[in-house]
Amino acid sequence: NHFDLAIVDPPYGIGAGKRVGTTYKEGVLRNKKGFGNTKLYTAKNWDNEVPTAEYWNELFRVSKNQIVWGGNYFTQYLPESRGWIYWDKKIINHQIDNYSDGELAWTSFDTVLRKVTYDWIGLGYCNSSEKGTRIHPTHKPIFLYEWILQKYAKPNDLILDTHLGSGSSRIAAYKGGFN
């Protein structure tokens, strides 16, 4: 239990890295008008499988509390919890049919379900103050991690992110004075 809080976003095993359709064309992400700046991504196999039981055992061994994005994909590895987080992306008029309206995060905290709302589309920023280029295919906004740290972490907590991705969690931790 070296880390006070693990905030992780492991691969969901849904093959997002090779999507073809509205957002991906032949394995390359297309920039769509109004969705902010997006980098082009080549199809990869990073999201074909979920982490093994060994990963989950180690995560629980090294951390006191956990927040797991996409927890709904890992129910076979996670204990029951009533303290889920629902991130409402405020997708207006469902502009992109193959993106969900929100995401779920399982938590180890014995608390009520919490909802955080932030304008966001997987392709980039939508009505967001967080301008810039998305640098990872499953990039989550810094604001989201700032909100999580304010609600679930204590000063001087040691934070773990096993799947750093774009580094949004690290930026939020740095800004909030967390290690």
Give residue ranges: language-model regions.
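Class I S-adenosyl-L-methionine
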Residues: 1-8, 12-44, 60-179
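A short glycine-rich, Lys/Arg-flanked "PGG" loop and its adjoining helix->strand segment in the class I
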Residues: 49-65
